[in-house]
Design a protein with these regions (language model features):
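C-terminal alpha-helical "lid/dimerization" subdomain adjacent to the S-adenosyl-L-methionine
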Residues: 163-211
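A short glycine-rich, Lys/Arg-flanked "PGG" loop and its adjoining helix->strand segment in the class I
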Residues: 142-154
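A conserved beta-strand element that flanks and buttresses the S-adenosyl-L-methionine
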Residues: 128
Length: 235
């Protein structure tokens, strides 16, 4: 009886975690297929932050303007900003380096499959990087941000939502545990939380605050912040 219960427990554990790769990657069909539901379970504020991004796109997008959605995944931002794109005859270029994500993309606009490190942005009005930089090699993050600040139009904006380092000491520990608690309360199993945390080792690294000295904070939830760079009206 005890052996049967043990076997059942392992079967349940495997069924909950079998889709999680040993080394986290978005170049994975199972990850792409689970992405939309999983990210909302893991980050209960995901849709709230999406609405915030859409608000700032509306605030900075001129008529006939261009939005870049960099690290577009399956099209979350594209769908959120469709109303303002339609109202202002705006255009969208969505960029992602995962063929698996691209196969499920439904955010509208033009989809470009490219590594952000290699992507040279055209002149644009608004760029969005929504939970992207933490998955990019730290040595290459500044290059991406510098290119964007060079290419953004006068009066435009760069909008960031990403994970940042926790403060030192016990408060930092408590903030991280808040993130874990939010996941558990959203229905993510403890086994899935643990496997995902181990999978992310070396694959997801918080973004250094020093990269954003000229950005303004508009959101903070636990380990995550929303920032915006408003481009000067005269460049």
């Amino acid at each position: 009886m005890a052996e049967e219960a043990s076997n059942t427990a392992w079967e349940d554990y495997y069924s909950e975690t079998s889709w999680i790769p040993d080394q986290w990657t978005f170049h994975n069909k199972a990850v792409a297929e689970r992405f939309d539901g999983h990210v909302r379970e893991s980050l209960p504020w995901y849709d709230l932050a999406t609405k915030g991004v859409a608000h700032f796109v509306r605030a900075f997008l001129p008529d006939d303007g261009l939005v870049l959605d960099l690290g577009a995944s399956t099209g979350n931002i594209g769908k959120a900003i469709k109303p303002v794109l339609d109202e202002r005859n705006g255009s969208l270029i969505a960029v992602d380096n995962s063929e698996e994500m691209a196969a499920l993309y439904d955010g509208g606009g033009e989809l470009v499959v490219s590594d952000l490190v290699e992507y040279v942005p055209p002149r644009f009005d608004v760029a969005v990087l929504f939970l992207v930089l933490m998955f990019i090699d730290p040595k290459k993050r500044k290059l991406i941000l510098d290119r964007l600040q060079t290419a953004v139009s006068a009066g435009g904006a760069i909008i960031i939502v990403d994970r940042f380092p926790n403060p030192e000491g016990y408060v930092g520990e408590a903030i991280h545990r808040l993130t874990l608690r939010q996941k558990k309360d959203a229905g993510v199993s403890l086994s899935e939380i643990a496997e995902k945390e181990l999978s992310l080792v070396g694959r997801q690294r918080p973004v250094n605050n020093s990269l954003f000295d000229n950005y303004i904070e508009w959101l903070r939830v636990g380990e995550f912040r929303g920032l915006i760079y408003p481009s000067p009206e005269i460049l």
